[in-house]
Amino acid sequence: KYNPNPEDMKMLKAISDAVKNNNADIGFGFDGDGDRCGVIDNEGKEIFSDKIGLLIARNLSTKHANSKFIVDVKSTGLFNTDNVLAENNCKTIYWKTGHSHIKRKVNLEKALAGFEKSGHFFFNQPLGYGYDDGINSAIQVCHLLNNQNKKMSEIINELPKTFQSPTMAPYCDDKEKYRVVEDLVKKIEEIKAQKTKIDNQEIKEILTVNGVRF
């Protein structure tokens, strides 16, 4: 038993087993109301939804150049460095995590699509009507597979290697969380100002639209 949640590792493991047992090309997992979609590749490996969003954005950009995409701040930084999106003059805006925040920003910016790491994907015209739709998300994945004529494992392996963890939500009292974030922002700003390297990299940008990202 598991929670019908595209971020739930037990659910993804069950879909992975089904993909391998049936020699399937792809596996999809939807939440209870069908507005989120998780993806398992042909080898039974789970793909975090932000990277699926990146692959969909790349595929859409070939037909919809000069488009905007909205992603939440938990999403991969590959959106900012992707050569396909750059070649098609597409812009990515990192925004607040949360269904309502991303949906509103997609419509405000008249973006083609919005992607949240939780699996909420939003599509504007001509792809959708601005709301999150798990079935539409799965269809867009099928489109990119068809257009590239490759296995999903091949497509995902062509992306630069990055390291991610599942979404974590450690407890923090509501009265304390804003102070914790403020203290963390100050610390990160000090590290940036001192040009202290983390994993041999200097901090280039600090994004505080929702917590802190660097």
Which sequence ranges carry the predicted segments?
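N-terminal small/polar loop signature for handling phosphorylated ligands or for N-terminal nucleophile
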Residues: 1-39
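Short glycine/threonine-rich catalytic loop with a Thr-x-Gly-x-Asp
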Residues: 6, 30-32, 46-51, 127-134
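Self-splicing inteins and homing endonuclease
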Residues: 26-27, 32-44, 106-115, 212
